[in-house]
């Protein structure tokens, strides 16, 4: 989906926002039926545009953009971006990568995949709690649960704690939206703070 098309979903998403599992009418083009969230996301930044897998594709894997520790007196941002790797069934040779907005720092990891055609169905964020003194990082890492029960943990950093799992998509995730704090110059940067997944049924 082009960014312009994704941006048209924002008014609808604002109406659908809830702390957990949010039901929605099926979208005629992308077929998403719900949006799942976590309650542990960081407080900074703004929600970017959603990005969706092509029709008939589901997220079977993911990769992360992570800035390594910067030491003192560096400014750590930890997790900067999430990509979903979308596949149709068990065919990984024909995949599509979707990415909502990402932060400016770090490098992308190699993708981690669910086994045997399973799809990503739920997630949990590792988030460092805000501190008034010191360097905030917000989201540090993410775990995904596959439809066969396998759990995949990304190669993020270790500050903070993993929060509760989101609700589960009935079949699989098919889209992503991220909450990003833009660069703040000499201020404290946190980059990625929160994320949402879209669920599809076909």
From Swiss-Prot:
Q: Which residues form the signal peptide?
A: 1-24
Top-level taxon of the source organism: Eukaryota
The answer to whether UniProt assigns keyword Secreted to this entry is yes
Which InterPro entries does the annotation name? VOMI, VOMI_sf
Q: Name one Pfam family in it.
A: VOMI
- Using the UniProt record, give the first listed, main subcellular location: secreted
Positions of disulphide bridges: 53-86, 114-146, 169-199, 174-200
Q: What residue ranges are annotated as transmembrane?
A: none
Q: Write out the entry's keywords from A to Z.
A: Disulfide bond, Secreted, Signal
Q: Which GO terms describe its cellular component?
A: extracellular exosome; extracellular space
Q: Where in the cell is it found?
A: Secreted
The record's family statement is: Belongs to the VMO1 family.
Know the name of this protein?
A: Vitelline membrane outer layer protein 1 homolog
Q: Which organism is it from?
A: Homo sapiens
Q: Gene of origin? A: VMO1
């Amino acid at each position: 989906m082009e960014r312009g098309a994704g941006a048209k979903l924002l008014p609808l998403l604002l109406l659908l926002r809830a702390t957990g599992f949010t039901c929605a009418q099926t979208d005629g083009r992308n077929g998403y039926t719900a949006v799942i969230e976590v309650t542990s996301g960081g407080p900074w930044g703004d929600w970017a545009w959603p990005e969706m897998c092509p029709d008939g594709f589901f997220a079977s894997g993911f990769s992360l953009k992570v800035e390594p520790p910067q030491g003192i007196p560096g400014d750590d941002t930890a997790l900067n971006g999430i990509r979903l790797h979308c596949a149709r069934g068990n065919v990984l040779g024909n995949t599509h990568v979707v990415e909502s907005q990402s932060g400016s720092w770090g490098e992308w990891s190699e993708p981690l995949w669910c086994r045997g055609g399973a799809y990503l169905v739920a997630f949990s964020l590792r988030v460092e709690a805000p501190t008034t003194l010191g360097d905030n990082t917000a989201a540090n890492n993410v775990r995904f649960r596959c439809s066969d029960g396998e759990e995949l943990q990304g190669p993020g950093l270790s500050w903070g704690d993993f929060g509760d799992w989101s609700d589960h998509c009935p079949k699989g995730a098919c889209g992503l939206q991220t909450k990003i704090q833009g660069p703040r110059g000499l201020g404290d940067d946190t980059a990625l703070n929160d994320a949402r997944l879209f669920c599809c049924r076909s």
